[in-house]
């Protein structure tokens, strides 16, 4: 119940046109390391490997709280909807204009008919497992809003039974709207 309230408040704040964006120049590599370090105990309970591949040092303008919330949610979902003894791989790369994060997992995948809807508020792919898996159905909506707030994009590639990959692209420099 508390999680639903917290998630709803996050969405409401992000929906405001003049949402408070606190942009700081950050070490993205370190932020990702911190996220994985915080989530590792959850992954370890199911013997899921958390892997971080950073192909180069990346510094960028982000709202630390909103960015961390978005990426944490993708990694948490990779753990939550995975198989025991699976893996979640987070990769970071950049070019002269954008940085790119992929979060890939060895989990159950998303049915093709649900892919278009997973960013909708309260949408759950498999409602029958909602109680045992947990969550509010708001996490991916919050993630998409947070990434959009950074003028970024998110795409999902998935095949049922073969895992899921989320690809995020965010400009290195934040330019206010």
Stretches with model-predicted labels:
Residues 78-79:
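Short helix-loop "hinge" at the ATP-lid/N-box region of the Bergerat-fold HATPase_c
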Residues 105:
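Acidic ATP/Mg2+-coordinating residue in the GHKL
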Residues 151-153:
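Conserved glycine-rich
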Residues 134, 139, 143:
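Short alpha-helical Gxxx[C/S/T] motif in the catalytic ATP-binding
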Residues 22-25, 44-45, 49-59:
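Conserved catalytic submotifs in the C-terminal HATPase_c
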Residues 110-124:
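Short conserved segment of the HATPase_c
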Residues 85-97:
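Short beta-strand/loop element within the Bergerat-fold HATPase_c
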């Amino acid at each position: 119940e508390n999680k639903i309230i917290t998630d709803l408040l996050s969405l409401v704040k992000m929906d405001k046109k003049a949402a408070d964006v606190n942009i700081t120049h950050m070490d993205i590599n370190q932020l990702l390391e911190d996220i994985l370090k915080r989530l590792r105990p959850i992954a370890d309970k199911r013997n899921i490997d958390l892997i971080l591949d950073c192909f180069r040092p990346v510094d960028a303008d982000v709202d630390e709280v909103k960015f961390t919330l978005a990426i944490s949610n993708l990694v948490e979902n990779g753990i939550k909807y995975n198989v025991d003894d699976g893996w979640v791989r987070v990769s970071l790369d950049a070019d002269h204009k954008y940085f790119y994060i992929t979060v890939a997992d060895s989990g159950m995948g998303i049915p093709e008919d649900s892919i278009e809807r997973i960013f909708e508020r309260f949408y759950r792919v498999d409602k029958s497992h909602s109680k045992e898996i947990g969550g509010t159905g708001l996490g991916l909506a919050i993630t998409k809003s947070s990434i959009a707030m950074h003028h970024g994009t998110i795409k999902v590639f998935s095949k049922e039974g073969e895992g899921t990959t989320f690809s995020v692209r965010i400009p290195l420099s934040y330019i206010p709207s």
